[in-house]
């Protein structure tokens, strides 16, 4: 499938002040483990575990609400490739896909990116929460609000 963005258009979409745009464009050195026409995947400088990788689109999207359908579909294909490579090359037993949107959610660089984090036996538990039972009435209210918002 042809890219919906011509190369010239993608370059226009880069944010001159965005460090991830510069890394994705190859202007700042990084340990690149994968690259194609849409993405560059690099090892994280502050890894949660050995092999922690960031998938960076070469086009600038602030977060998942701005990413195009084509990029959204293809980022999961890249994540799957990386996950398989992590199992084969690094011997991890699993991996987490983490994608934060907005400061309140922990996004520190306002350029869409996905973390692929290898998980090893006996490794630190990093993705967890304390589930609390939900009340049926609250679920119904939240569900109605979300369905209404999805119709807009």
Residue locations for each model-derived region?
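HIT superfamily nucleotide-processing domains
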Residues: 2-152
């Amino acid at each position: 499938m042809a890219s919906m963005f011509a190369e010239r258009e993608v370059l226009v979409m880069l944010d001159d002040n965005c460090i991830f745009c510069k890394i994705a464009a190859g202007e700042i050195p990084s340990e690149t483990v994968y690259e194609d026409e849409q993405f560059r995947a690099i090892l994280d400088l502050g890894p949660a575990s050995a092999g922690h990788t960031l998938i960076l689109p070469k086009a600038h999207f602030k977060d998942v609400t701005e990413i195009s359908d084509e990029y959204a579909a293809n980022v999961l294909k890249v994540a799957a490739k990386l996950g398989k490579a992590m199992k084969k090359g690094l011997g991890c037993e699993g991996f987490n896909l983490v994608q934060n949107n907005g400061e309140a959610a922990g996004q520190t660089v306002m350029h869409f990116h996905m973390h692929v984090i290898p998980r090893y036996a006996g490794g630190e538990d990093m993705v967890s929460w304390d589930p609390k039972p939900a009340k049926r009435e609250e679920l119904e209210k939240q569900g109605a609000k979300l369905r209404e918002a999805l119709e807009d």
